[in-house]
C-alpha cells in the first residue's frame, strides 16, 4: 500500500521469503490441542475425534518420513489435474451439469494462482462456451440453454475477467445483465438467486460482484441491500443466509464482501464478526470450520480466512491502533501447514480433509486460502510468509472477488470506459474498485 493511511488489498508478485521456523503442527506439545470432551461423548465430539485421529496420522507420517520436514506444493500434479479438467470431465461430474461455469471459474482461477498461462485457443473455447450459457434475458445459466441463475452468473463473469481479453469482455451483455438483476431485486433490498427462487446473502454478493466488475451499478439497484445484509448478522457475530439464521462461513464472506463493494462495512458489528471468524480456526488441525461445532474443511481456507483481509482493511479505516501491519489476524502458518500436509491429493488436486476425494471446488478454494495466508498487504507494507520451499509461493488473490488483483483492475478499468446501461453519464461512487480505495 502507498501509506499507512491507505490500506489496500493489492499484493504485487515479489521475491517472497520462506518461513524457516519449525513446523507448528509437528511440535511435540501440539497434541495437547486435540479435543477434550471431559468424558461426555456426543455425535459431534465423536466425529471431531475421528478427524483429529486421521490428521494426527498425517502429521506423524510426515514427521517420520522427513528427516527435515519440508512442505512442498505439488504444482506440476495440480497443473495437470486442472489442465485435463478444462478439456474433458469424467461421468462423475454429471451431477454438476448445472454448474459448468463454476467448473470454468474454479479451474481458471486455480491456474492463475499457480501462475500457469491460459493458451489463447483454450481461452477462446471458454469464451465461446460461456456465451452459450448466457441467457437472452440476461445473466448466465449453469449450462447452454439453462435458466439464468446468479451463482453461475458470478462464476461466468469471474472466469471471463480472469481471461481478461476483449473477446472475453465482449461476451457479457451488460444491458441484459442489468435488466436481469432488476428482475431479481426484492423490496427489502435482497435478491432472488433466480426468478422464482430463494433469497439469501449469496445472491446479494453475486449481484454486487458482477455489477461492480462490469460497471452496471445504478443509483437504486442496491437500495436497501446493505441494511438487509446487516440484519443477517446474528448474536454469534457471523452472518446467516437470511435474518435469524445460524452464522456460516460462506454466507459471512458473501455478506461482508458485498458490503465492501457497496462501501457499507460499518453496517456490521465488525468486532463481533472478528471474534466469530477467528474462533473458526481449528486449534489442532490449523484449518477452518464453517460453523461452530462443525468439522474442518479445506474450502473454508478461503471463505473464512478471506474475511480477515476485509476486516483488517475495515478496522484500519476506523483507525484501530491494535492492528498488526505485518500479519492477518489468524494463524497463517498453521493454515498453510494444514493445506500442504492434509489437503493435497498425491495424484494432483486438493481436497476437504484426509479421507475425502479431490475436486475442482476444493482445489480452487484451498489454493485461494493458501494465497491469502502467504501474502499480507502491498507496497511498502508487503509482508509475505511462505511455508516450505520457495516454489510454494502462489500469485495473490483479491479477497473481495477471488480473482487476481490485476484482473480486477483490468476489468473495472475496461468497463468504466463504458456508460452504465440506460445512463448517459453515471459516475456513482460505488463503481470504483475496492482494491484501490
From Swiss-Prot:
Pfam families for this protein: Prenyltrans
* UniProt site (Important for selectivity against geranylgeranyl diphosphate): 102
Cite the GO molecular-function annotations of the record: geranylgeranyl diphosphate synthase activity; protein farnesyltransferase activity; zinc ion binding
User: Which keywords belong to this entry?
Assistant: Lipid metabolism, Metal-binding, Phosphoprotein, Prenyltransferase, Repeat, Transferase, Zinc
Q: Superkingdom, according to UniProt?
A: Eukaryota
What residues bear Phosphothreonine in this entry? Answer: 436
Q: What does this protein need as cofactor?
A: Zn(2+)
Residues where Zn(2+) binds? 297, 299, 362
User: Does Transmembrane show up as a keyword for this record?
Assistant: no
The residue spans of each PFTB repeat are: 123-164, 174-215, 222-263, 270-312, 332-374
Q: Which Gene3D superfamilies match?
A: 1.50.10.20
Q: Which Gene Ontology terms of cellular component type are present?
A: protein farnesyltransferase complex
Q: Which residues carry this modification: Phosphoserine?
A: 432
Record CDD domains = FTase
**Cleavable signal peptide:** none
Residues that, per the record, bind (2E,6E)-farnesyl diphosphate: 248-251, 291-294, 300-303
**Transmembrane among keywords:** no
Known function: Essential subunit of the farnesyltransferase complex. Catalyzes the transfer of a farnesyl moiety from farnesyl diphosphate to a cysteine at the fourth position from the C-terminus of several proteins having the C-terminal sequence Cys-aliphatic-aliphatic-X.
In which family does this protein belong, per the annotation?
Answer: Belongs to the protein prenyltransferase subunit beta family.
Assembly and partners are described as: Heterodimer of FNTA and FNTB.
- Quote the protein name from its UniProt record: Protein farnesyltransferase subunit beta
Could you tell me the gene encoding this protein? Fntb
Amino acid at each position: 500500500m502507498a501509506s499507512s493511511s491507505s490500506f489496500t488489498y493489492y499484493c504485487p508478485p515479489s521475491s517472497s521469503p520462506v518461513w524457516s521456523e519449525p513446523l507448528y503442527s509437528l511440535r511435540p506439545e501440539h497434541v495437547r490441542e486435540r479435543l477434550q470432551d471431559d468424558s461426555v461423548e456426543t455425535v459431534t465430539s465423536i466425529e471431531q475425534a475421528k478427524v483429529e485421529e486421521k490428521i494426527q496420522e498425517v502429521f506423524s507420517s510426515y514427521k517420520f518420513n522427513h528427516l527435515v520436514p519440508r512442505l512442498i506444493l505439488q504444482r506440476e500434479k495440480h497443473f495437470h489435474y486442472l489442465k485435463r479438467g478444462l478439456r474433458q470431465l469424467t461421468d462423475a461430474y454429471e451431477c454438476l451439469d448445472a454448474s459448468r461455469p463454476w467448473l470454468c471459474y474454479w479451474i481458471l482461477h486455480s491456474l492463475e494462482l499457480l501462475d500457469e498461462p491460459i493458451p489463447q485457443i483454450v481461452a477462446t473455447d471458454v469464451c465461446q462456451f460461456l456465451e452459450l450459457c448466457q441467457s437472452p434475458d440476461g445473466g448466465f445459466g449453469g449450462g447452454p440453454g439453462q435458466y439464468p441463475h446468479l451463482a453461475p452468473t458470478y462464476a461466468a463473469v469471474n472466469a471471463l475477467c480472469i481471461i481478461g481479453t476483449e473477446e472475453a469482455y465482449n461476451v457479457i451483455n451488460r444491458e441484459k445483465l442489468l435488466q436481469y438483476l432488476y428482475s431479481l431485486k426484492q423490496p427489502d433490498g435482497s435478491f432472488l438467486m433466480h426468478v422464482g427462487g430463494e433469497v439469501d446473502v449469496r445472491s446479494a454478493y453475486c449481484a454486487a460482484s458482477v455489477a461492480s466488475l462490469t460497471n452496471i451499478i445504478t443509483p437504486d439497484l442496491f437500495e436497501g441491500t446493505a441494511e438487509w445484509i446487516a440484519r443477517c448478522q446474528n448474536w454469534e457475530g457471523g452472518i446467516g443466509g437470511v435474518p435469524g439464521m445460524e452464522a456460516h462461513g460462506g454466507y459471512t464472506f458473501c455478506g461482508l464482501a458485498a458490503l465492501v463493494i457497496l462501501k457499507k462495512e460499518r453496517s456490521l458489528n465488525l468486532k463481533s464478526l472478528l471474534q466469530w471468524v477467528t474462533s473458526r480456526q481449528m486449534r489442532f488441525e490449523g484449518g477452518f470450520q464453517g460453523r461452530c461445532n462443525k468439522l474442518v474443511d479445506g474450502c473454508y481456507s478461503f471463505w473464512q480466512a478471506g474475511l480477515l483481509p476485509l476486516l483488517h482493511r475495515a478496522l484500519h479505516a476506523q483507525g484501530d491502533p491494535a492492528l498488526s501491519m505485518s500479519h492477518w489476524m489468524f494463524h497463517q502458518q498453521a493454515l498453510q501447514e494444514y493445506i500442504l500436509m492434509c489437503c493435497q491429493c498425491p495424484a494432483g488436486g486438493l481436497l476437504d480433509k484426509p479421507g475425502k476425494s479431490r475436486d475442482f471446488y476444493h482445489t480452487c478454494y484451498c489454493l485461494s486460502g493458501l494465497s491469502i495466508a502467504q501474502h499480507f498487504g502491498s507496497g511498502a507494507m508487503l509482508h509475505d510468509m511462505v511455508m516450505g520451499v520457495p516454489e510454494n509461493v502462489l500469485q495473490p488473490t483479491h479477497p473481495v472477488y477471488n480473482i487476481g488483483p490485476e484482473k480486477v483492475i483490468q476489468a473495472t478499468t475496461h468497463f468504466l470506459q463504458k456508460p452504465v446501461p440506460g445512463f448517459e453519464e453515471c459516475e456513482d461512487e460505488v463503481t470504483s474498485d475496492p482494491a484501490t480505495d
